[in-house]
Amino acid sequence: MTGNEQNPSKWLAAEKKYDSGVYNKHDVVMVRGQGATVWDENGRSYIDCVVGYGVATLGHSHPDVVKAVQEQAGKLMVMPQTVPNDKRAEFLQELVGVLPQGLDRVFLCNSGTEAMEAAKKFAITATGRSRFVSMKRGFSGRSLGALSFTWEPKYREPFGDAVDNKSVDFVTYGNLDELRAAVTEQTAAVIMEPVQGEGGVRPASAEFIQEARRITREKGALLILDEIQTGFCRTGKMFACEHFGVIPDGMTLAKAIAGGTPTAAFAMMSEVADRMPAGGHGTTFGGNPLSMAAGVASLRAMKREGLAEQAREKGAYMMDKLRAIQSPKIREVRGLGLMIGVELKEKSAPYIHAMEHDEGVLCLAATPLVVRFLPPAVISKEQIDQVVAAFERVLNNVNPREERQAELRAQQSEMGQQQVSQGESVQTE
Ligand SMILES: Cc1ncc(COP(=O)(O)O)c(C=O)c1O
């Protein structure tokens, strides 16, 4: 039991009452974070291997980011992108400095899905084409434009024809023949994640991603890599495409880009940017000075602290430890850097719940069978040891089938009790 179940919090009640209802809320209220640790309102600590779906790769409340935000908040928070701003210029310079060569034009926005929207529009104006190739099991976000690239039917079907799924061909991630057949002279862009995150933590093969580069060039289409989850050191390089020696024409960026502030970008080659008419796209909050200040501090800290090397080394350490777990429930441990998935032979949800509830470790699902770990790169090896030990205990102790049967037995006996007492009351009246 968490403290909240014993003593329901007013914050938990308020959030559950007023939220739109689209989220499956946990029974816990988080109030503070530092590095790889977060604390709930009752003071219980958790090792965070979710970090806001992969946002806080630098750790929660990194001191440089906190200082930059504090200073900028007292100076200037709002300036639209039509009016140049010192922090925005500094951020753009820093960002282009770490991006693969040639990606030196940037559209700034606020979330991953907006970066995908931008990518879609820039690809259409750059090529004069409007067909796309995306990947089965791919996830690109949930706005209607981005949703057209997202494969999972449950995210698309509730919105029927409002999601444009006629102009997108989905190919099996890794299938070279399907890829070659799908990319034609009508294709504006091929969209893919270098490691599928939501789709089960699946790294692309070098052959597949390199063939995507080759065939898009041959057909005059763009290659757009979705590095929203993989970017900014998560996979052990600043960007995952560096593992494959591939430079795309455009790259969508978000999550860890700016120290936890809601920031995103579509970075592209000049030839792609130059074809968008002035005023053809825009956003109010994109490139706001507050996020830009956080972004500058975050990018500098990533470089100074060797965050990519940390993610590479700790990722290998954690993956080795997970692979050493002897459990018949594990089908496969896979990933790249600190983007790690453990595919089980059964549903992952009860194990993820037990990790949080019983062990104080936050992790998340990626498809119903996969437990996904996205710890910050500043996590210590001791914390990794704790996470792996907790996971092993949970695999040993949780038995969803037995628990479900016990639940059913309890329900049946409760119903039996009710029938007996109803029967008794009838008799006694
Ligand atoms: C690969 C990928 N693309 C796009 C998105 C959408 O980003 P956002 O949730 O910021 O809109 C996500 C979010 O998880 C993602 O992992």
UniProtKB/Swiss-Prot annotation:
N6-(pyridoxal phosphate)lysine found at: 255
GO biological process: lysine biosynthetic process via aminoadipic acid
Cellular location(s): Cytoplasm
A single Gene Ontology CC term: cytoplasm
SUPFAM superfamilies according to UniProt: PLP-dependent transferases
Domain of life: Bacteria
Catalytic activity from the UniProt record: [amino-group carrier protein]-C-terminal-gamma-(L-lysyl)-L-glutamate + 2-oxoglutarate = [amino-group carrier protein]-C-terminal-N-(1-carboxy-5-oxopentan-1-yl)-L-glutamine + L-glutamate
Binding site for pyridoxal 5'-phosphate: 112-113, 139, 226-229, 284
UniProt entry tagged with the keyword ATP-binding: no
Keywords: Amino-acid biosynthesis, Aminotransferase, Cytoplasm, Lysine biosynthesis, Pyridoxal phosphate, Transferase
Pathway: Amino-acid biosynthesis; L-lysine biosynthesis via AAA pathway; L-lysine from L-alpha-aminoadipate (Thermus route): step 4/5
Cofactor comment: Binds 1 pyridoxal phosphate per subunit.
Cofactor(s) needed by this chain: pyridoxal 5'-phosphate
Matches recorded under CDD domains: OAT_like (cd00610)
Family matches, as Pfam families: Aminotran_3
Low complexity bias locations: 411-429
HAMAP family: LysJ_aminotrans_3 (MF_02084)
Protein name stated in the entry: [LysW]-aminoadipate semialdehyde transaminase
Gene symbol of the encoding locus: lysJ
